[in-house]
């Protein structure tokens, strides 16, 4: 979770002022980080989870086992619907750790957060 919190420091979030960081672990132990990157055209914003996943895929990794998501919030920082669907393309069994300020976190399997994925 510390790695995800550290990744949030690189966030570009001038509109929401809500920095988020993610650390995505692959089956070989490689970890890819990501942060949210906002844009004035809000639909162009990319979440921390998808940033980390795109970095992993671009480096040849698709075997995701765990993702930690950290946001400076009183509530647990849960992945949005788009991120849930995006990650499910690679594994519905991956562990999703959702943290909040103060170091507490909850853990789910991705399939619990998105029980009915879209498949083409």
Regions found by a protein language model. Name each.
Residues 39-40, 113:
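A short acidic/small-residue loop/turn micro-motif
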Residues 35, 43-50, 54, 75-90:
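Local cysteine-cluster metal-coordination motifs and their immediate loop/turn environment
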């Amino acid at each position: 979770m510390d790695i995800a919190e550290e990744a949030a420091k690189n966030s570009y979030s001038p509109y929401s002022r809500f920095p988020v960081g993610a650390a995505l672990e692959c089956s070989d132990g490689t970890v890819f980080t990501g942060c949210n990157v906002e844009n004035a055209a809000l639909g162009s914003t990319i979440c921390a989870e998808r940033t980390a996943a795109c970095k992993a895929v671009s480096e040849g990794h698709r075997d995701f086992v765990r993702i930690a998501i950290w946001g400076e919030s009183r509530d647990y920082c849960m992945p949005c619907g788009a991120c849930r669907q995006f990650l499910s393309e690679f594994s519905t069994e991956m562990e999703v750790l959702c943290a909040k300020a103060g170091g507490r976190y909850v853990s789910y399997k991705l399939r619990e957060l998105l029980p009915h994925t879209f498949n083409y």
